[in-house]
């Protein structure tokens, strides 16, 4: 495919590029000014050949960021922005030049200059030279398919979807900047003493000596001579006010940290265009990362993230460990390259295991913030969320050293408890408060009494209850304590006595003992996961013994199943779900029941078997998927209550008499017709 693309490019056969509007929210001012941005995507047959032409030069270009006057290929993290801003001398005048309608204003003259630079840097290869010339001819004069089906051919401007857009734009601004400096009378040597600038695409950032600030006034005119519209009036004396690529650097601990405008960060949270809940969580995490440096904003985003993780379906993702999170120490490491201290890590580990010693909740999510409280605990629906202060923000990585230390602490506390018990048993006359090491509080004679907080009763006398002769037929005291398990009273599974009778019947028919039944039922459960529990199945079912198939008759399974085989197998629902999850932990596994229903989400595989028991803990997506699969399996199916009755005869006596002159055995004559 790459060779065919190169061949097309060499022969000058242009592809049709696809023009479309950018999927973005634009300010009202931009919309009213009709500055809607478009995107021009390269066709595949041009794209592959184009990458062959430009990739080597582009990779070299990226490697020279900050060494040369461009930042293409730099990272804003790990003190990258600090290195960038410190390239500008202190006390100079800083200008963030603003270019408007950049791509559409580029002239063929500038594009041809980029072509000349690439040809100069290219190895001696005649075929590649022709491909490169044809590529930039196609970029300049591009056939574009518009959304209404019209194909137009442009004659100027760069294409936003070509594989070297940013590098080419940077080169064209670089050429124009050198042109403006030369025209202002500065050669290479004098330029280095009075001007430092960096470019990234159409973004231009300039630092100029105060004695030469007037030169900026002539730059707009010089840029316009080459077709570019730039404004050089935004000038600053403080580096922190300098905007470049929509970022400005703010000083935190003497390091310049790149920051977007707070409104842009909030917009990441406001505009939800994600199709999957995982993508929504990733967007919130991205906003959390971008907000670091704006203390209050980061705190509010963490609070919002805490709330989101309590809502469906995000709470299910968190329980499965699929909710991304970045700690305060992780963010500090990302921006400043500083590792978290051992004290911070140990504080986190201590707090973690302190919470873990109790009953393990369904979900533990640790959140860090800049709030004054060290830890704020919020509990909702068995969900524990911890807010951790910045001072104790630590990384979540656990190492063996901390685990060993925690085990030692546990052993010491156990010994201490045993010692206290022994001391308490020696003195039986010691009061309870003394045994526990706590003193009774003195009574304050000046108190005026206590107030009792009223409790609302679950059942009141005002409830409308079923009654006979004025007396309620319900025992409310018993009802308050009666909380049976749903599965124990569900009519979708056989009762325990029915299951035991089925077990005994199958065991006797198969001639197995209890230990053999355990192994056999493992195989039966896996077979039913794959093949279902329809009452119409017959023949044999199969279990594997290594590479050998072992057959078992199905008849005993169905005969002893009351009320139905599916209701018997419902007892295996939880084990089957765990088995599928276990298989998916080591390989991609979807039961045949899910494959037949074309279930594409592998995370729902654990619910893709027909004897799964839906309960109140089943996630909404899983419940919907299971119901849809069941509806698809049962569609247009019907069962006959009666088959053909073989004992009923439809015989009758035929008293018809025929002679040899009759036409046939059903007709005496042809009613007068003759041959």
UniProtKB/Swiss-Prot annotation:
This is Genome polyprotein. It comes from the Viruses. Genome polyprotein of potyviruses undergoes post-translational proteolytic processing by the main proteinase NIa-pro resulting in the production of at least ten individual proteins. The P1 proteinase and the HC-pro cleave only their respective C-termini autocatalytically. 6K1 is essential for proper proteolytic separation of P3 from CI. Residues 390-424 have a biased composition (Basic and acidic residues). Pfam families: Poty_coat, RdRP_1. GO terms for cellular component: viral capsid. The lineage of its organism: Viruses, Riboviria, Orthornavirae, Pisuviricota, Stelpaviricetes. It catalyses: RNA(n) + a ribonucleoside 5'-triphosphate = RNA(n+1) + diphosphate. InterPro entries: DNA/RNA_pol_sf (IPR043502), Poty_coat (IPR001592), Rev_trsase/Diguanyl_cyclase (IPR043128), RNA-dir_pol_C (IPR001205), RNA-dir_pol_PSvirus (IPR007094). The keyword Nucleotidyltransferase applies. Its EC number is 2.7.7.48. Belongs to the potyviridae genome polyprotein family.
